[in-house]
A protein has these predicted regions:
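A short helix-loop-beta-strand connector motif used in the catalytic cores of GNAT acetyltransferases and
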Residues: 40-54, 75
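Conserved beta-strand in the GNAT
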Residues: 54, 60-68, 73-80
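Conserved GNAT acetyl-CoA-binding A-motif
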Residues: 102-113
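Glycine-rich acyl-CoA binding loop
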Residues: 76-77, 87-95
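Conserved active-site alpha-helix within GNAT-family acetyltransferase domains
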Residues: 92-96, 115-133, 138-139
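A short, internal acetyl-CoA/4′-phosphopantetheine-binding micro-motif in the GNAT/acyltransferase core
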Residues: 79-86, 113-115
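A short beta-loop-alpha structural element at the N-terminal edge
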Residues: 1-15
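Conserved GNAT-fold acetyl-CoA-binding loop/helix
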Residues: 15-43
Length: 153
């Protein structure tokens, strides 16, 4: 089940986020990637701002995503799934949920992921996102930026 996050979910969201991003950090041999430095206060702030959705398996938080609207653009961020729950369509469902929530308010969705993150790129491209540009961040990390125009009913 996917729905809005509540402040009481912050600790679980942060735990899932850290678990999910450890594999990303390993891909880039960098334990200091930004999502691993997020704090409980950062997660709470996103929740209070109405940006966060969670996926639950019973009472357990198994995934989360943020949708940050600025003008006519929604930036999709921190899409995470608990490592033991991957491959079950949770990431796709979270992405679809944030898009459905914001589709009437925005002209496009944007997001980025690391260039070595093949699973993430497959998910985003499969959901209709197209590459727009690549930004080199370090010698081992480039960010692939993607965007999508909402489907209007």
């Amino acid at each position: 089940m996917i729905g809005p996050a509540s402040p009481r979910d912050a600790g679980e969201i942060l735990t899932v986020q850290h678990a999910a991003y450890v594999t990303e950090a390993q891909l880039y041999d960098d334990p200091h990637i930004v999502p691993l430095n997020d704090t409980l206060d950062d997660v709470r702030a996103a929740i209070v701002a109405g940006q966060a959705l969670v996926a639950r398996d019973g009472s357990r938080v198994v995934g989360a995503v943020r949708g940050v609207v600025d003008g006519d653009v929604c930036t999709v961020a921190r899409l995470v799934v608990a490592p033991d729950m991957r491959g079950r369509g949770i990431g796709s469902a979270l992405l679809a949920a944030v898009e459905a929530r914001e589709a009437g308010r925005v002209e496009r969705f944007v997001l980025f992921t690391g260039h070595r993150s093949a699973g993430n790129l497959r998910l985003y491209r499969g959901a209709g996102y197209v590459d727009t540009h690549v930004v080199a961040v370090t010698g081992t990390l480039s960010l692939v930026h993607l965007e999508k125009t909402p489907v209007r009913g």
